[in-house]
């Protein structure tokens, strides 16, 4: 398998941190960009995105490795998106479109991380990739728009839908429940949701 030079928007999150651990250390800056501790890439700024992808492509050529962009950046506040869908769209859809355009211009492959929220959520079996999307939330609508922008914007693109991601770093449901358990005598959580908890390190390795 060829060595990769990664650009990971959203590199400060759970998935980004695990991707950073998988990057070849000896490649230095060409091995991983926008890792924890570095400045985050603003995917809503098309010029900045174009410059970042161009720099990745050049560094990869100089190092003899394969450049790949993994988009882990997202507006993930599901409830808040209902009040500010425009902001969610700016990141989840327009930002994804900017990445797709930049990757197409440089012939850099793009892996876009999406969500099960693109489906209606009322099925009685696990969803298949071929099932028709039918988002019922602002978050889901903006993520579906991002998927379509990526797949329509560059031929060398893949969409990976995941759900209930948790990991060693960052905020997630598991950490929230552990914190609340220490603060409260009793906890109330929904009991009518079924999903696929996804360990972020496993997801990173799969990508």
What positions do the PLM features span?
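Adenosine-cofactor binding site in Rossmann-like domains, unifying the SAM/SAH pocket
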Residues: 27, 31-52
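N-terminal Rossmann NAD(P)H-binding glycine-rich loop of SDR-like oxidoreductase domains
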Residues: 4-24
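Catalytic helix-loop patch of NAD(P)-dependent Rossmann-fold dehydrogenases
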Residues: 83, 90-98, 118-160, 164-165
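NAD(P)H-binding glycine-rich loop region in Rossmannoid oxidoreductase-like domains
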Residues: 43-93, 102
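NAD(P)-dependent short-chain dehydrogenase/reductase
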Residues: 151-197, 201-202
């Amino acid at each position: 398998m060829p060595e990769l030079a990664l650009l990971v928007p959203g590199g400060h999150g759970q998935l980004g941190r695990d991707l950073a651990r998988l990057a070849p250390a000896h490649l230095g800056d060409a091995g991983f960009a926008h890792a924890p501790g570095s400045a985050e890439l603003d995917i809503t700024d098309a010029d900045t995105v174009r410059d970042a992808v161009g720099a990745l492509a050049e560094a990869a050529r100089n190092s003899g490795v394969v450049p790949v962009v993994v988009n882990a950046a997202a507006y993930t506040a599901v409830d808040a998106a209902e009040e500010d869908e425009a902001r969610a769209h700016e990141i989840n859809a327009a930002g994804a479109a900017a990445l797709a355009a930049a990757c197409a211009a440089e012939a850099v492959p793009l892996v876009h991380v999406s969500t099960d929220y693109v489906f209606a959520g009322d099925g009685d079996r696990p969803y298949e990739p071929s099932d028709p999307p039918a988002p019922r939330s602002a978050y889901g609508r903006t993520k579906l728009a991002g998927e379509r922008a990526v797949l329509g914007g560059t031929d060398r693109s893949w969409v990976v839908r995941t759900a209930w991601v948790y990991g060693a770093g960052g905020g997630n449901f598991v950490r929230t429940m552990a914190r609340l358990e220490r603060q409260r005598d009793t906890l109330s959580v929904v009991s009518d949701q079924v999903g696929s908890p996804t360990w972020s390190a496993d997801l990173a390795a799969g990508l």
